[in-house]
Amino acid sequence: ILQLIEPFERDGTLVKRDRTEIERDIANYTIIDHDGVIFACAALYPYPEAKTGEMAALTVSPQSQGQGDGEKVLRRVEQRARAMGLESIFVLTTRTMHWFLKRGFVQVDPDWLPDARKRKYNWDRRSMVFVKKLS
């Protein structure tokens, strides 16, 4: 996971995560692999009190982009969220808003975020918030 996300952290697309954080949160991650090589991943951080969850660190390897791995990760994250009883998932992004809009997400104000997440929101980063209702 670290090797996959590191280039995107370096260019500012993703927020930096260290090995300790990823290891601590490994159960939150969904991966797509081919022959043992990880080509896509995303983490789901639930906010059960708000019946929503944050999909974070959605990353697809450049070699795999356009081949449906991002869609597969999204579907798996949605399935996990539904199994947890969540009614929506949200993402914070600075660059890939069109990808999310094409997949049923809608932009909302950062004030929409659950209080626990709002307290950690980095206003300097100016991330846009997108939400998708799960059916």
Regions found by a protein language model. Give the residues of each.
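Short amphipathic alpha-helix that is part of the acyltransferase structural core
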Residues: 1-17, 33-34, 126-129, 133-135
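Short loop/turn motifs at secondary-structure junctions and domain boundaries
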Residues: 20-26
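Conserved beta-strand in the GNAT
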Residues: 31, 37-46, 52-59
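Conserved acetyl-CoA-binding loop-helix of GNAT-fold acetyltransferases
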Residues: 60, 66-79, 83, 91
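Conserved catalytic-core motifs of GNAT/GCN5-like acyltransferases
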Residues: 92, 101, 106-129
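A generic "binding-loop/recognition-motif" signal
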Residues: 95-96
